[in-house]
Amino acid sequence: MDLDPNLVINHDDTNLSEISYTMEQDSSSYSLEMGGTPSSAGHRKVDMWQNHNFDSGFQTMNHSEAPSIISSLHPSSHLSGMSSMAEYEPIPNLSEQQKQKFDGITKNPTDGQYNTVRAIPELTMLMKDQDNEVVQKAVMIMQNIAKMECDAMRRQNETKIVDPCVIFTLRNLLRDKVDHPNIIRFTLGTLFNICNRQEGIDLVTRAISEQPDIIPNLIRHIGTFANSIYKYAILTMHSILSDKQRGGQSVTIARQQDAIIHVTPWLEAEKSEKLLPVIVDLIRVLCEKNTDQKVKFVKMGGPQKLLHILQQRGYENLLWRSTQLLKTFSNFDAPCLVAFGGRQILAGMLSHGSPRLVLSTLETLRNISDVPSKMKEELLLKSLLELVNSRNAVIRLYSAQTMSNLVANNRPNKEYMCSNNGVVNLCRALAIATKDWQNFQDKEAQQMEDYAESLICTLRHLCVGHPLAEKVQAYVFREPSIFLHKLMTMRPVLLKHTLNLLLKVVSQNALLAPFLLCRIGEIGFVEQLIHILRVACTQLNVQDVIEGVRVKDIVHLCIQILRLITRNPDILNEVDFFLRSPENSRMGDGHTLPIFVLQKANVEENTKSSTLELIYNLMHHEKMADHLERDEILCKMLHSVQMQAANHPELANLAANILKLMSEKRERNRIHYGRHGSFESQFGHLSVAAQRTEVLNSHGETYEGAGEQWSQPMSDDSMMESYCNSSGRDSSKTYNSPMYHSPPSMYPEYPNGPPSGPYYDPHAFTSTRPTPPHYANYDSPPVYNNIPSNQGPSSHLSDQYPYRQGRF
């Protein structure tokens, strides 16, 4: 390929302000849909260039003939090139002496054009000439060669600029020709075009390893406004630093030279919406995984400048890159972003038509949503309520997680959610997620589990801390089988949040009826709660944490719920039935679950306090009271706790109350037995506690640890088998949850998925399980349909819950 020496670029300073820089989208069709690309002025002399046999591409940017390859080389920048409004004129006549210096460049005898292969060494020498006009022409021709080589349609098979001496010479020009802006501009343009191909990047980075001062000279010109030199310097710097293979050394040098201090001011000063994305991405590269650079950026007001860009600009690519950079600082200095109104500004981005912009915005919002703020956030909450049912799984997940953080410990946000159908939307979303759960596998199932977890957590926050809390609890528990299903999945994180929500719900007497009546198959809440408690107890001495959830927390929540629900006589009967079942009454040395919990030294004091309150409630059941009274270990522990009143007054008081109940019961029995003979004559055939222990020991069985030695049915009931592997706790590992690969079901006779039948059976069961009380007329309490802005059950299909094969 040959060059026409009769053309030169004559840049007019009045047109330099119109130079634009194109940041290509991921796909051309997406750019057309968004319609956000700022218009650029037309080229006035395209027709003239079409009549010449060479087009450098620098001025016309004729993409239809010469598509850029920078997108494939630097996917992070997607920079297609530079355009200019420069005029093209014949080269001004050089003096004869100046022309003679170019006579040494070899020409082809056929067409009289310069031969690029042989011209490069000559041009390299001419760029060292003392005559600045000669240097300018030489570097201009070198720039045209570099532009031709980065053009896939114009370059020859063999790369021509391969000599590091070319880079060193360009470096010298950047250092020595500071007073000649045209030379500097052509030099930077040459470097930029060389960096537009991978071979050129390798050449430049090798030169930098030999002469590191190339980077400082580039940084020096970032602050040069004349002839828009700073634009060329920023583009060239970005091309070098964004190379993923060899850019690391250059990034280190740039950080040492405080490049970020020179680049950051242009976020505010630059007007071009196409150069700003390059500046933002350059800052991202400099700040990536470097705390010092982030601190400098924050001190210079960088986050505020980015938020200002989001408010004032409309170019989608610029907005997306700005949110990507803000996402980095959301994990570094979240309070700073919130203090400058970051949540309110980012909320405006959620209605944008770009999915990647919405997703990036949501991720940033999620990272700063846990920061307390007194600012109004109605717009943000409204947008999140719309996105929580999005078809995009990641968008709805981030929306739910952000919403959960916003309503936690924030009364105004809770009241807004309750008065704007927030509870209704969340319950509907949870019902849909529960219905669709069994249709997903692996990664999709993991996302669905995280989504359900966030919804339950949000509902739990809405159940307390505001005047409408009781009404919300009643509305949330209209379909109790959803939460029973979550308990039956035995997923640690879901268990924790579901148990927390149930702890709020069962505080209402009106909600104990659906709690008792709800069934999936034959499994009810009480049986499942006791099963979870038993499985957790077996792991107290084995492992403290399972997938981020403390086993102690599961034990404490189960005890708390059992303590609250046993105030109901019907539920107390059911609790007694399951606690005295063989698998639950032979924990450790043959004790029931509450006594086993009291024995564990690693259980916290608040858990022991709740356990004593549960035992106190159980003492009001005749059969369970007999069972507890015969346990000598329990009596010894109660006396021991009572004697430690100075250190644990609350526990001592509870122990004293239980011992008082036991004493009163013995007194009643003594009076009763006195009428009909001695206790031994009436019940002499029964074994007392000591005899029972001797019988157990006579079989040679030992009861140590957490009951894991029981052959039936405890031997196969380890935590890791019963608690399925929860989702997303270690993103570095492949998600392979046993829940989604058909593990042995906890209850083989019942399906794992949501049932198709009604959620409770008004008729008596034929099994040996306790029969729930029959309610002749069971209606929802009036508060169910009294949520603000909820006009009660709607007859319109779109306002009802999704259709199911019957209720759970």
From Swiss-Prot:
Q: Which SUPFAM superfamilies match?
A: ARM repeat
Entry's Gene Ontology cellular component terms:
adherens junction; catenin complex; cell junction; cytoplasm; nucleus
The protein's GO terms of the molecular function aspect are: alpha-catenin binding; cadherin binding; nuclear receptor binding; protein phosphatase binding; transcription coactivator activity
User: From start to end residue, where is composition biased (Polar residues)?
Assistant: 723-736, 786-798
Comp. bias intervals (Low complexity): 737-750
Spell out the residue ranges making up region: Disordered. 702-808
Cellular localisation: Cytoplasm; Nucleus; Membrane; Cell junction
| Name used for this protein in its record | Beta-catenin/armadillo-related protein 1
UniProt lists the gene as bar-1
